[in-house]
Amino acid sequence: MDGFSQQLEDLYPSCFSPCPSPLGFSEPVIQPFAMNLAPAAQKDFQQHPNRREVTKIPGAGEQSPVQNVRPKDAINPKEADPRSPTADASLVPASQRRKRTFFTQAQLDILEQFFQTNMYPDIHHREELARHIYIPESRIQVWFQNRRAKVRRQGAKATKPILAGHHYSGTSGANRAMFPSAPAPNSSSHQMTTSRAQVQPLKESQMNMFHQNQGFLPYPDSSCNVSRQRFLMSQPTPGAYHLPQASSNVYNQNVKSQNPLWNQQTTNRVYTNMMETVLDLSRRPSQQMPVQPMLMNSFQTNKNIKPEVYTTSPQIPVSTTSSQVSLFANQEPCHMSTTQGGTYGQISPISDSGVSDTSPEPSSDWEENVASVLLNL
């Protein structure tokens, strides 16, 4: 420490007195040291004084700085309340509420007269009215806005009773239509609805009868619907077999049965005659069946026939003189020959199982019915 103070003394001889202090620093050393500090350091040095000064206990005659501070509750409310009459005028805020504008009857008449001609005046018209009746232009604009809103409210109230009247009238009309004693509003539509309701059961009953009678027709007992359709399509026309006139109209009756106004009794009578004819033909004794090439060729088979199993059919001359003459008029019966045994084996058009089979199937009831019908005709 002594060496350091000696160096300072050599560097700054003017700042040290000839009698050094016990700490090794003279009194003037503090002044240039404090002056060489930065401004922030000087401020901190000034704000933080010595502890001895802070912990100084006040005397009896001195007052503590804490006692000089008054609490908030001790402040006079008259000094803090700006609404007090004794408060300063600069502290009282200005009122933001706009004063109400009162119109005289003459001013209202002029505004109402102008409103009848123009409901939406522009800025020029409003300024002209303001100069004429001595009212600010902004007040005139507000008056026109309120007047238009009043017109809209009046229009809405005027339309509500009319709509309510239409609603009640429509409801009463619907109630009158529900009761049979009151006349219907549209008699033609009511009659059409009644007629449709009466025709619908008749149409359904005729359709049911048609399907029931259709089920009695002789078609093969097969689980496949395609074979039934092919059998019905392969049937020749009634004129080729000289059937009675009643049976020739069966196809027309089937078409006419779709008409709901067709007589049900006539349809039942035609079907009854047809069924009697078919049953009578099926009861006759069986004869040798002639071969018809067209009938045999109409059936398409999906089975492969072995080479040793085949049938032969001779060619039959067809008469072209008249379409009404039977195809079997001048033809002699022909016997079918087979290479194996004497049993005639016919392959069904479509297999029930759906798998191709090369073995022929035995004759069925369907083949016997076809043979009996063709022989008797």
From Swiss-Prot:
Region (Disordered): 41-93, 334-369
Record keywords, A-Z: Developmental protein, DNA-binding, Homeobox, Nucleus
Upregulating conditions: By activin and TGF-beta1 (immediate early response gene).
Family matches, as Pfam families: Homeodomain (PF00046)
Biased composition (Basic and acidic residues): 70-82
Bias-annotated ranges (Polar residues): 336-362
The organism's place on the tree of life at top rank: Eukaryota
PANTHER family: HOMEOBOX PROTEIN MIX.2 (PTHR46123:SF10), MIX-TYPE HOMEOBOX GENE 1-RELATED (PTHR46123)
Protein name from the UniProt record: Homeobox protein Mix.1
Organism from which the protein derives: Xenopus laevis
Lineage: Eukaryota, Metazoa, Chordata, Craniata, Vertebrata
